[in-house]
């Protein structure tokens, strides 16, 4: 390198050094504190370029949040986290279907809320090789097959220490039966009772017998007069219920009243009069009514006493053989179908009706052919012959048409010699007449 070039380079360095002095080292520790947060390392403070501190300067102190973070980093068994498994950590992002569905948003009207109807998703947990299929209704559910907890609660939880009696073995209490609860899940109060049941009590602490069960309180002893029972015949009054009855007399040692004759029960129609010398319960008319035309028989009663005539037979008429002209009774509810219909409308095995018959069997009283001109097959002079005598018989024969011939283009046929000159037609016998149908 040439000497002048070296001199120019050294001169340039000096100019730049004089123009921009070094201020980095001078402003390095101008902060009122000795050091910032980046110089804190655990409990020690790393000082660089230490100098005499100002009057109110002090070392930054660690806060409660810093202690909580340091304590959470330690792996101590007796300091667990609430709602967190020490070996399973919650994954912040889902691998499958991470965004909420639209119908969930419309139903909840909240952007990121996932309630009981959330959809399934795959989660990964450190320490577990396989993926856990999370499909539980609650946010902090468990897998049904692996029984692995989903993770810690998303909200922040404060640290807590185990109680002092956690290390002691707890006594296992026997399974108890659920107590009956009242309103608002409160205990139902029970009346105090002795531990040993009495001689007259059953297993349910109730007194034996229907009398004691009806009473709330146990029976108490009372004074009873000699000769008066507690519940005897004198307790009830005589007579029927609902009617005024005399007061009953006390049952004592005295003699009972003499027995009277049994009461005679009369028929309903004879309650106002004297009883008749006839057997009980035999009556001619129901409830003692009068004999009327439908109930009584015609004529006087038979003079000779005897049994009553059977129902529907006369006692004065003897039994005779059946008469030949007697009409046989038939079933009134039977359905006889066609043979009981009107004779005028139904005709069995009859021929066809003529064209001019007023009854066309349609239950309409109109003529079959009111106007003959409406039919093209009937000539104009046909109505003139309708007034003559009609002859019942078969329909008149229609003249047979001639067979068609295989005509050529020149108009001659292929038939015999009598058809060579062309197709000939026989003269018509007369006008066509419509016959009976």
From Swiss-Prot:
Residues 371-382 have a biased composition (Low complexity). Residues 1-31, 77-437 are annotated as: Disordered. Residues 119-132, 143-164, 198-209, 217-253 have a biased composition (Basic and acidic residues). Disulfide bonds: none annotated. Residues 1-29, 81-91, 101-118, 133-142, 165-190, 284-293, 324-348 have a biased composition (Basic residues). This is Uncharacterized 50.6 kDa protein in the 5'region of gyrA and gyrB.
């Amino acid at each position: 390198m040439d000497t002048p070039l070296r001199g120019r380079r050294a001169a340039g360095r000096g100019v730049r050094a004089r123009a921009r002095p070094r201020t980095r080292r001078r402003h390095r520790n101008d902060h009122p504190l000795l050091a910032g947060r980046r110089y804190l390392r655990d409990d020690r403070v790393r000082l660089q370029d230490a100098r005499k501190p100002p009057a109110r300067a002090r070392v930054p102190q660690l806060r409660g949040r810093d202690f909580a973070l340091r304590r959470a980093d330690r792996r101590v068994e007796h300091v667990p986290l609430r709602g967190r498994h020490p070996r399973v950590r919650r994954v912040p992002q889902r691998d499958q279907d991470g965004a909420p569905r639209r119908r969930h948003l419309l139903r909840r009207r909240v952007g990121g809320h996932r309630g009981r109807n959330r959809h399934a998703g795959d989660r990964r947990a450190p320490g577990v090789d396989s993926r856990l299929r999370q499909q539980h209704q609650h946010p902090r559910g468990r897998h049904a097959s692996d029984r692995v907890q989903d993770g810690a609660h998303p909200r922040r939880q404060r640290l807590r220490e185990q109680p002092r009696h956690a290390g002691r073995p707890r006594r296992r209490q026997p399974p108890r039966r659920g107590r009956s609860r009242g309103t608002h899940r409160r205990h139902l109060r029970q009346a105090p009772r002795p531990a040993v049941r009495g001689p007259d009590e059953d297993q349910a602490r109730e007194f034996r017998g229907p009398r004691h069960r009806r009473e709330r309180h146990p029976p108490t002893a009372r004074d009873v007069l000699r000769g008066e029972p507690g519940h005897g015949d004198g307790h009830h009054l005589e007579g029927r219920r609902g009617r005024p009855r005399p007061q009953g007399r006390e049952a004592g040692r005295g003699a009972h009243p003499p027995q009277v004759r049994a009461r005679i029960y009369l028929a309903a129609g004879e309650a106002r009069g004297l009883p008749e010398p006839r057997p009980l319960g035999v009556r001619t008319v129901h409830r003692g009514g009068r004999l009327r035309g439908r109930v009584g028989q015609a004529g006087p009663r038979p003079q000779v006493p005897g049994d009553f005539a059977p129902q529907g037979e006369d006692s004065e008429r003897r039994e005779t053989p059946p008469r030949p002209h007697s009409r046989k009774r038939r079933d009134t509810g039977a359905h006889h179908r066609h043979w009981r219909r009107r004779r005028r409308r139904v005709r069995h095995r009859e021929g066809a009706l003529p064209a001019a018959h007023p009854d066309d069997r349609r239950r309409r009283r109109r003529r079959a052919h009111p106007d003959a001109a409406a039919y093209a097959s009937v000539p104009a002079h046909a109505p003139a012959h309708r007034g003559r005598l009609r002859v019942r018989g078969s329909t008149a024969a229609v003249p047979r048409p001639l067979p068609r011939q295989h005509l050529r283009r020149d108009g001659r046929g292929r038939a015999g010699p009598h058809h060579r000159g062309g197709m000939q037609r026989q003269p018509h016998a007369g006008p066509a007449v419509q016959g009976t149908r």
